[in-house]
């Protein structure tokens, strides 16, 4: 069921979505946690997925030239028979890399959207944030960072796509899991992030389109205004986040995000243990939280 959301709340949630979708810190987690901290209702998976379409518009705009090159290069390769061109490898890497999250998403859809789903519990988000922080740190420590987009293989896309499927669990982070996988595979940070963002396009599109249908069927019970406000806010801040992060990763490591994720997860666990944040009832009882 769609929650009632005001214009101001929508703009704030769009800002949160835009900044956190492409930073490796989990947009879904922050869209769940920020409302809880501010005393707002959980916007739900449908609204969250629809404002992700703003993030989709941003990445399509930012990578417009890349996408044109990939598509035109693939069409050209079909004519010439050059199946090993960079554009063809990127194309199939993105297409095949999207399959794991589609399969997992369909399998878990009812669980993720069920009222009081344990997967949307704040305690789950906290643990996922800490675990992914550790994995991101390991990928920074062990990754060789010698590979670029020029040498990407289709199998790289599939492996990174499998990592993307983990992001269905709030707190994992789509960009976090895919960037971590890319670093483990030896990619340079900025190149890993670029492929991560390109790989996100089909997944965000399919997810947002599916949930948009849900909101249309419900007749926009929360009003069209908050949806538009959240979409515009998400678009603007997503574009800024993409541009900033790619420039940042050219010279810096992801350590700042590792530290943030550790503290974010630890803070959540502390607030839950102190009874200052409510968790989903079955999880709260299982963990004996106040």
UniProtKB/Swiss-Prot annotation:
EC number: 3.6.1.27
InterPro entries referenced in this protein's UniProt entry, alphabetically: UppP
Transmembrane annotation, as ranges: 5-25, 44-64, 88-108, 122-142, 152-172, 195-215, 226-246, 255-275
Subcellular localization: Cell inner membrane
Alphabetic keyword roster: Antibiotic resistance, Cell inner membrane, Cell membrane, Cell shape, Cell wall biogenesis/degradation, Hydrolase, Membrane, Peptidoglycan synthesis, Transmembrane, Transmembrane helix
GO molecular function: undecaprenyl-diphosphatase activity
Any single biological process term in GO: cell wall organization
Membrane topology reported for the UniProt record: Multi-pass membrane protein
Catalysed reactions, semicolon-separated: di-trans,octa-cis-undecaprenyl diphosphate + H2O = di-trans,octa-cis-undecaprenyl phosphate + phosphate + H(+)
Free-text function comment from the UniProt entry: Catalyzes the dephosphorylation of undecaprenyl diphosphate (UPP). Confers resistance to bacitracin.
Family matches, as HAMAP family: Undec_diphosphatase
Family: Belongs to the UppP family.
Classification via NCBIfam families: PRK00281.2-5, undec_PP_bacA
Protein's name in the database: Undecaprenyl-diphosphatase
């Amino acid at each position: 069921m769609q929650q009632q959301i005001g214009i101001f709340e929508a703009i704030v949630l769009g800002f949160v979505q835009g900044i956190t979708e492409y930073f490796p810190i989990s947009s879904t987690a922050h869209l769940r946690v920020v409302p809880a901290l501010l005393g707002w209702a959980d916007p739900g998976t449908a609204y969250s997925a629809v404002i992700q379409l703003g993030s989709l518009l941003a990445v399509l705009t930012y990578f417009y030239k890349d996408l044109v090159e990939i598509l035109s290069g693939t069409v050209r390769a079909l004519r010439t028979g050059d199946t090993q061109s960079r554009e063809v490898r990127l194309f199939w890497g993105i297409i095949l890399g999207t399959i794991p999250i589609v399969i997992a998403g369909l399998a878990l859809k009812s669980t993720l959207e069920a009222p009081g789903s344990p997967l949307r519990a704040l305690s789950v988000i906290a643990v996922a944030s800490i675990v992914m922080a550790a994995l991101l740190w390991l990928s920074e420590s062990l990754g060789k960072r010698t590979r670029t987009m020029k040498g990407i293989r289709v199998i790289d896309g599939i492996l990174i796509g499998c990592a993307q499927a983990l992001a269905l669990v709030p707190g994992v982070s789509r960009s976090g899991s895919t960037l971590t996988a890319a670093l483990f595979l030896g990619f340079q940070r900025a190149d890993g992030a670029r492929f991560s963002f390109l790989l996100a396009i089909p997944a965000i599109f399919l997810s947002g389109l599916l949930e948009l249908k849900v909101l249309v069927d419900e007749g926009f019970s929360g009003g069209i205004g908050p949806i538009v406000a959240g979409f515009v806010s998400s678009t603007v801040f997503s574009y800024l986040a993409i541009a900033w992060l790619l420039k940042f990763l050219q010279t810096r490591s992801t350590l700042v995000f590792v530290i943030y994720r550790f503290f974010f997860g630890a803070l959540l666990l502390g607030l839950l243990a102190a009874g200052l944040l409510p968790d989903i009832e079955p999880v709260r009882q299982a963990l004996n939280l106040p």
